[in-house]
């Protein structure tokens, strides 16, 4: 908004609105009072034959900027809207909402009063087309309890809880938005099949992840998911519709402003983005966003939201002979070549990379640190047995699939920090050494002392690692331990194993580091690591919680995680009543520390009191970067096209209504201008679905970076 231009409510402006009334999609201006706008806003009212349409979206999109750009707002109780602060361009504007079909697109410019006609859906099927994926996904059936335990084709080791875990936030749902139109239907290009189960058996063998997907469903789950996925899509094809209808945005949800930009390419995905230092959220104010394309490309997307320009940076590796990071032992979920032809890309190899950049994090100096490969998988000698490195003496490491790199945006210098431990998510601690802690480190906690790195450039000296050891001896120090799977022995500690640390969460005040632990293999839960004693504490998710994926820690030390039971799981160590170390403190000793906060959205049949929301990651807004207040946990709402925040005990859905299929794997907050109110802050995320061609727009659609802001009212400009 340019406040120097004043309110654009002149008679001339109103006259323009009147002249436009003959065009499809517009209402006569006299039917509603003009809303207050500036010269860089578009505003008006939305009505249908039933009257004002409250809680629907008005979307403005343009292709006249360097990259495709869209802005979306929600109407107030009188159907009024204001789309603020639009760059100069011609826009297509239309209405989208539950109970409606998209209105005809109308051409408009900033500074224009524009009343719009909403189009009621002619039938239930047309209305359901716009429902979030969760409403369609929950039409799929879950096997009955009697089919588990070896009584059916479901492998005996798979329990009902395991099945729900894998349907809710791992397996297919961890990479794709199941329930969107492209997944609830079978593409014609795939071929003709006798049954839906047969079609799914062919479908998941497609592309460079076909082998991985086939192994998960056909081998580990005995091929039974094909039956349930096939039955689901068969019923959809016959015209069956969701049992539930979504509510329109209410209250604070109507104050949300969403801005999106295309970036990346139509063949690659952007796993995550970073905008600032979560400890100091004014770092990189108004600056570029840096994306992580993981194993789809070495071309890191960069978005400048001020100039609306999307570029890329080619991420190198230190070893010019390093192989591509595909297939075991590099990356088990993708292969060099498609297993079977893709219905979209045929036999083309669309992904190619060596850096495998998974996630980035800003430091307070404005540099970006990445969990990225710098070499092949075999570790150098200083990591291995016989090395004099202090960490290697305790626990030598032979391999790491991904290490650490750093980009200084001021010079575009790219540095390699060769770590012995693997990496996945980086997060800076609150210590004087600006230690960056990494997850994805397998059996150890891994860290890089960035102060030492800055002073010496010596990656060997700057890094350290330690195994996860429970103090089951109870003496407050690391002793001889029993190995994973061995029976406990009096006087010995216990080493933990499994899939290891996933999310990493340095405590803001006490120096400890927390992780979500064993997301994929082993008992899932939260793990606390003490950098001073090198001891760990483990708190297993109770059975009714099923599991956890991404998580974060709030300013009070409470843990928050995306639960596999359709809830936001919290854990407060301060509520534990029993001892936190000793022979009984092995994971199940503090159920009283856990609480569950149900996500919005329906559950599967038979689990109606739950939500099927497949949240991938949770982040806590320490600094009110979004506009909902400090210390607010926010989860990705992967089946509802956006994010969901827990504020004052209420779930607030922050939906990205266009293009449908928004599926984030992380989120970040930034304050661009602390004195600019809601306009100077916002939440950042990107569409992280591995297959952008499955979202609205189809083949050719690119990932979108989004900026979500919460203004004081739906008409704030």
What are these language model-derived features?
Residues 40-42, 48-64, 88, 137-149:
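Short, ordered, surface-exposed loop/turn motifs in non-cytosolic proteins
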Residues 270-273, 313-318, 348-353, 398, ...:
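Surface loop/turn motifs at the tips and blade-to-blade linkers of beta-strand repeat domains
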Residues 36, 63-84, 106:
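Short, acidic Ser/Thr/Gly-rich low-complexity loop/linker segments typical of extracellular
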Residues 169-180:
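The canonical Cys-X-X-Cys-His
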Residues 51-54, 82-90, 98, 107:
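Short Pro-Gly-centered beta-turn/loop motif in secreted/extracellular proteins
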Residues 62-68, 90-109:
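A short, solvent-exposed loop/turn motif at the edges and junctions
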Residues 264-285, 347-365, 425-433, 493-510, ...:
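Structural signature of eukaryotic scaffold interfaces centered on beta-propeller domains
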Residues 181-189, 284, 291-295, 301, ...:
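Short, conserved, GDST-rich strand-edge loop motifs in beta-rich repeat architectures
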């Amino acid at each position: 908004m340019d406040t120097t231009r004043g309110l654009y409510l002149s008679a001339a402006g109103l006259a323009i609105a009147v002249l436009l009334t003959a065009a499809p999609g517009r209402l006569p201006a006299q039917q509603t009072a003009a809303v207050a706008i500036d010269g860089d806003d578009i505003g008006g009212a939305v009505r249908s034959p039933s009257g004002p349409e409250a809680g629907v979206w008005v979307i403005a999109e343009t292709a006249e900027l360097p990259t495709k750009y869209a802005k979306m707002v929600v109407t107030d109780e009188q159907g009024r809207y204001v789309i603020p602060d639009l760059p100069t361009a011609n826009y297509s504007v239309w209405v989208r909402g539950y109970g409606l079909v998209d209105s005809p697109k109308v051409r408009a410019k900033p500074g224009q009063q524009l009343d719009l006609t909403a189009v009621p859906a002619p039938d239930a099927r047309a209305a359901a087309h716009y429902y979030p994926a969760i409403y369609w996904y929950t039409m799929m059936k879950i096997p009955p309890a009697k089919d588990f335990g070896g009584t059916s084709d479901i492998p005996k080791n798979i329990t009902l809880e395991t099945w729900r875990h894998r349907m809710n936030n791992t397996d297919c749902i961890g990479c794709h938005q199941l329930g969107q139109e492209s997944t609830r239907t079978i593409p014609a290009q795939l071929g003709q099949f006798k049954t839906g189960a047969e079609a799914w058996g062919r479908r998941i063998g497609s592309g460079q992840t076909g082998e991985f997907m086939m192994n998960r469903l056909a081998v580990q789950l005995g091929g039974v998911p094909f039956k349930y996925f096939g039955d689901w899509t068969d019923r959809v094809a016959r015209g069956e519709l969701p049992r539930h209808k979504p509510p329109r945005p209410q209250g604070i949800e109507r104050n949300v402003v969403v801005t999106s930009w295309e970036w990346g390419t139509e063949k690659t995905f952007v796993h995550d983005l970073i905008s600032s230092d979560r400890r100091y959220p004014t770092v990189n104010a108004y600056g570029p966003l840096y994306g992580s394309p993981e194993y789809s490309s070495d071309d890191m997307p960069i978005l400048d939201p001020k100039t609306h320009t999307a570029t890329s940076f080619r991420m190198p590796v230190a070893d010019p002979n390093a192989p591509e990071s595909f297939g075991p032992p590099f990356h088990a979920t993708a292969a060099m070549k498609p297993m079977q032809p893709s219905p979209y890309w045929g036999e083309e190899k669309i992904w190619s990379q060596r850096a495998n950049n998974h996630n980035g994090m800003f430091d307070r100096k404005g540099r970006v640190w990445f969990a990225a490969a710098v070499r092949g998988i075999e570790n150098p000698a200083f990591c291995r047995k016989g090395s004099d490195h202090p960490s290697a003496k305790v626990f030598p490491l032979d391999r790491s699939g991904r290490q650490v790199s750093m980009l200084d945006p001021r010079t575009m210098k790219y540095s390699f920090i060769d770590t012995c431990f693997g990496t996945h998510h980086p997060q800076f601690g609150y210590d004087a050494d600006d230690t960056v802690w990494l997850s994805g480190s397998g059996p150890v906690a891994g860290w890089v002392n960035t102060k030492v790195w800055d002073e010496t450039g010596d990656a060997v000296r700057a890094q350290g690692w330690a195994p996860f050891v429970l103090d089951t001896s109870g003496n407050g120090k690391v002793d001889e331990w029993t190995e994973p799977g061995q029976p406990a022995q009096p006087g010995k500690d216990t080493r933990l194993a499994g899939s290891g640390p996933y999310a990493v969460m340095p405590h803001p005040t006490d120096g400890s580091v927390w992780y979500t632990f064993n997301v994929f293999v082993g008992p899932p839960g939260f793990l606390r690591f003490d950098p001073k004693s090198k001891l760990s504490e483990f708190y297993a998710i109770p059975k009714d919680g099923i599991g956890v994926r991404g998580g974060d820690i709030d300013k009070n030390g409470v843990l928050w995680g995306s639960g596999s039971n359709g809830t936001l799981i919290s854990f407060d160590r301060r509520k534990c009543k029993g001892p936190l170390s000793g022979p009984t403190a092995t994971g199940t000793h503090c159920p009283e520390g856990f609480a569950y906060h149900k996500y919005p959205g329906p559950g599967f049949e038979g689990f109606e009191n739950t939500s099927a929301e497949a949240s991938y990651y949770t982040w806590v807004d320490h600094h009110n970067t979004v506009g909902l207040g400090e210390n607010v946990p926010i989860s990705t709402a992967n089946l509802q096209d956006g994010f969901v925040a827990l504020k004052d005990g209420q779930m607030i859905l922050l939906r990205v209504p266009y293009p449908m299929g928004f599926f984030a794997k992380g989120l970040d907050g930034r304050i661009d201008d602390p004195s600019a109110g809601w306009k100077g802050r916002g939440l950042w995320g990107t569409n992280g679905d591995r297959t952008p061609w499955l979202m609205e727009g189809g083949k050719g659609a690119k990932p979108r970076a989004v900026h979500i802001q919460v203004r004081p009212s739906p008409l704030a400009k």
